[in-house]
Amino acid sequence: MSKTKIYINGKLIGTCENPEEFVEEMRKKRRSGEVSPEMNITHYPENHEIYIFTDPGRARRPLIIVEDGEPLLTEEHLEKLETGEMSWDDLIAAGIIEYLDAEEEENAYIAMSPDEINDEHTHLEIDPSTMLGICAGIIPFANHNSSPRNTMEAGMTKQALGLYASNYDLRTDTRAHLLHHPQVPIVKTRIIDVTGYDERPSGQNFVVAVMSYEGYNMEDALILNKASLERGLARSSFFRSYEAAERRYPGGQEDRFEIPEKGVRGYRSESDYRHLDEDGIINPEAEVSSGDVLIGKTSPPRFLEEIDEFGTVAERRRETSVTVRHGEKGIVDAVLLTETVEGSRLAKIRVREQRQPELGDKFASRHGQKGVVGLIVSQEDMPFTEDGIVPDLIVNPHAIPSRMSVGQVLEMLAGKAACMEGRRVDGTPFTGEDEDDIKEALRANGFETAGVESLYNGITGERIEAEIFIGVAYYQKLHHMTTDKVYARSRGPVQVLTRQPTEGRAREGGLRFGEMERDCLIAHGAALALKERLLDESDKYEALVCADCGMIAVYDKIRDKKYCPICEDSESFPVEVSYAFKLLLDELKSLCIFPKLILEDKA
């Protein structure tokens, strides 16, 4: 029998002949307190390897130890915990509960509930929902969803708007979102109670109908009720902070907060400085839009070689004011004046913008059902129930079956029952309220147990033939909003090197006309449209080409003369090329390759 290697934190430290006994002995020592409870040990018999981990940073979770088919945690322990005679640490010290990492959990046989324990089980879940993290733990009835949907929701929860910090009014975060009327979810989980999610909720309870609406909610688009939005549904504020400091430079020069004078290099128009106070800083509650100056600032010149007509060095200051970002607007929310570590003056301006949901804003339920707003409909045109209930949101029925997010269907049923009974429903995965109890609550309040109702067309007033599934679901507004993403450009800055438009919304860049778009125009035979996009509207350049040698010729502006650097006296002709092509020729020359352009008469 080959010896089993033992690794500690990935380093080989020795071997042993009886691996099963060794691992069992180490676990006993850990449970009795002889070895640190933070140690985890795993045996891989097929590889003849034992791994021991003690390093920090491992994700570990608590489980109840099971021995001989019986959990070590008894009713007596639970009573002592309730009275305070025992604490959590006492349970660990007594070897009743232990923490396992991912490696050791690989070889553990964990029971979900005490009823299913047999002689082979090694551990028992404290509660089945504890296997989920914080983000996945807020999903009600998560055990009824497919795992990719739960994974998606765990990611999107972090993007949901809510009360991100209770002291948001005292902070100057670079960017921040704040939901105006966050609500606690009607359908909750035990992890929501444990984590204090109710203190900082990040969503609202929507009345949701599952039906199509004129095709405007196909492909996960959502239909929103305009009246609900006007009442404040999913309304939020966006905060952006700007800052500037009076930096000091070698030679005693420094930046200054002031309203720049007209002689300053880079001076803007007077209207751009209209909101500034005498000290060069904007007043609170001023309404600003992109390009408006928030902090008027001038800086010393970069170079001191400029000599005026009297022979002295001229100090012509530069305009370096802080302006509102391109494409943004808002109201100055707060102005903070303080000092940097070096003792220079520091100004911070926070601008707020109120945002009502609009077409293209992203929403998601707690079951990975994400979608963007496809249409905002007046309340009088929305469908309504026999009781006069108008849904806040309409989602497409196609979003449910293939994704198997049955948890959302159950949440809508539970939310409806909770609203009628004036209580919150426990939707904890595996151990929440039973589906039959929820259906019974609906029946007791005069509703169909399947959650369907007869709806009437808001436009014609006729009863819709199909019965519509309608209920209450918790929806989250995510920070992906149209206002931050919509962009168009007709003219703007170009790059110095390639003379092509810059890239990106923040830099007022162009929209890339890529290879695939080019191929489409080629396939259509739209030659002039292709030339317009890729040449005329991009980086058109008139290059002079020598007729004899095919080299790029030079134009001497002072002597008003065109000449070839090689042939000198030969004739040269203007040729329209892309500047990127001219740049390529220059780079080939730097590699000692002689590119020649052969000229022909224009047809």
Swiss-Prot record:
Chain sites annotated for binding Zn(2+): C546, C549, C564, C567
Pfam family, one: RNA_pol_Rpb2_5
SUPFAM superfamilies, per database record: beta and beta-prime subunits of DNA dependent RNA-polymerase
Principal subcellular localization: cytoplasm
PROSITE patterns (UniProt xref): RNA_POL_BETA
Record-linked InterPro entries: DNA-dir_RNA_pol_su2 (IPR015712), DNA-dir_RNAP_su2_dom (IPR007120), DNA-dir_RNAP_su2_hyb_sf (IPR037033), RNA_pol_bsu_CS (IPR007121), RNA_pol_Rpb2_4 (IPR007646), RNA_pol_Rpb2_5 (IPR007647), RNA_pol_Rpb2_7 (IPR007641), RNA_pol_RPB2_OB-fold (IPR014724)
Listed GO MF terms: DNA binding; DNA-directed RNA polymerase activity; ribonucleoside binding; zinc ion binding
Gene3D superfamilies the record matches: 2.40.50.150, 3.90.1070.20, DNA-directed RNA polymerase, subunit 2, domain 6, RNA polymerase alpha subunit dimerisation domain
Keyword Translocase: no
Required cofactor names: Zn(2+)
Family statement: Belongs to the RNA polymerase beta chain family.
Name of this chain's protein: DNA-directed RNA polymerase subunit Rpo2C
Organism, as annotated: Methanothermobacter thermautotrophicus (strain ATCC 29096 / DSM 1053 / JCM 10044 / NBRC 100330 / Delta H) (Methanobacterium thermoautotrophicum)
Designated gene of the protein: rpo2C
